[in-house]
C-alpha cells in the first residue's frame, strides 16, 4: 500500500551460539500509525527494533523504508538512522553538554545546519516535550523522566519518518513514568509514525493503533488495540494474565487522564483516540 512507511518481511536474527532471537517476523507500519510491540522478556522485541535501525544486522529478511530496502550492504547506515529515529531505555545524553546542545548536536553535524538554525529547531521540539525551561541544564541536574524527554526531543529534531521507542520507561522510577508516557501520547495524537516496544500494557492498549505480540521470536498475534481486551490466542491470554493487567503505578493513570483531556482523549480502555 502507498501509505506503508515501514515494512518488515521474514526477519530473522541468530546470535552467536545459535540463539534464534527473531524467527520470521512480518509486519507493516503505516503513515501516522502507532504500533506497539509487546511480549515477555526474551521474545525478540528489542532485537527487532535494533535490526530496523541497523544497530545490529539481521541474519535474514527484508526491511523496507517507503519501499526502499535498507538492510543491504550498499545502504548508507548513517542515512538510515537519520530517517529512523530511536529512543533507548537509557537516555544516551552527553553529560558534558547542556540540554540545548544535546539536541542541536545531530542537527549541526548530520544535517549541516548553522548554530542558529539548529537552535531554532531544538527550541521548537523542546517546547513540544515541555523542556523549554531547562535548556541550560546539564543532564546530571535532570530527573530520569526529564532526560528521557530530552532524548525524545533529540530524535524529533532530526525530523525522522518513523520513531522507534525501546522500552522508554523501563529505566525510570515509577513516579517519573507518567510524564514520558504523556509525551509519547501527545506524539501519537499529532500523527507521528511510531513503533513502541513496551511492557506498559494499558498504555499500549490506549495509545497504539495496532498491537504486535511476539512470543519466542515470532508474531503470535497481531491486531487492533482491542486485542488487549479480547485476545484471540491462548498465548496472548496467558501473557496478559501474567502481566497483572495494570503496569502503570497507582496515581500515574489519574495524572495521565487529567493531562490528556485537553486533547480530547481519555484513556478509557477502548483504544479510541482522535486521529489527525
Where are the regions that the model predicts?
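ABC family nucleotide-binding domain
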Residues: 4-6, 12-208, 212-222
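Intrinsically disordered, low-complexity serine/threonine-rich segments
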Residues: 50, 261, 273-275
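C-terminal boundary and immediately downstream tail of ABC-type ATPase nucleotide-binding domains
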Residues: 216, 226-268
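Long, low-complexity, intrinsically disordered segments
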Residues: 266-276
Amino acid at each position: 500500500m502507498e501509505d506503508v512507511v515501514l515494512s518488515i518481511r521474514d526477519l530473522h536474527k541468530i546470535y552467536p551460539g545459535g540463539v534464534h532471537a527473531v524467527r520470521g517476523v512480518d509486519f507493516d507500519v503505516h503513515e501516522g500509525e502507532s504500533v506497539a510491540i509487546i511480549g515477555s522478556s526474551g521474545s525478540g522485541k528489542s532485537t527487532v527494533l535494533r535490526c530496523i535501525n541497523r544497530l545490529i544486522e539481521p541474519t535474514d529478511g527484508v526491511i523496507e523504508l517507503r519501499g526502499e530496502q535498507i538492510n543491504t550492504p550498499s545502504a548508507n547506515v548513517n542515512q538510515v538512522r537519520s530517517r529512523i529515529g530511536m529512543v533507548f531505555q537509557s537516555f544516551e545524553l552527553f553529560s558534558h553538554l547542556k540540554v540545548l546542545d544535546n539536541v542541536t548536536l545531530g542537527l549541526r553535524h548530520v544535517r549541516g545546519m548553522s548554530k542558529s538554525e539548529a537552535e531554532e529547531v531544538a527550541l521548537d521540539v523542546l517546547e513540544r516535550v515541555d523542556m523549554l525551561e531547562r535548556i541550560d541544564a546539564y543532564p546530571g541536574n535532570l530527573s530520569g523522566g526529564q532526560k528521557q524527554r530530552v532524548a525524545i526531543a533529540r530524535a524529533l529534531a532530526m525530523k525522522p519518518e518513523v520513531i522507534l521507542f525501546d522500552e522508554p520507561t523501563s529505566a525510570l522510577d515509577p513516579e517519573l513514568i507518567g510524564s514520558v508516557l504523556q509525551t509519547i501520547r501527545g506524539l501519537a495524537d499529532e500523527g507521528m509514525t511510531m513503533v513502541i516496544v513496551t511492557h506498559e500494557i494499558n498504555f499500549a492498549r490506549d495509545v497504539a493503533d495496532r498491537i504486535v505480540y511476539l512470543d519466542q521470536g515470532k508474531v503470535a498475534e497481531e491486531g487492533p488495540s482491542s486485542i488487549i481486551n479480547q485476545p484471540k490466542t491462548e498465548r496472548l491470554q496467558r501473557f496478559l494474565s501474567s502481566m497483572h493487567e495494570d503496569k502503570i503505578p497507582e496515581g500515574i493513570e489519574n495524572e495521565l487522564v487529567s493531562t490528556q483531556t485537553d486533547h480530547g482523549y481519555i484513556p478509557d480502555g477502548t483504544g479510541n483516540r482522535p486521529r489527525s
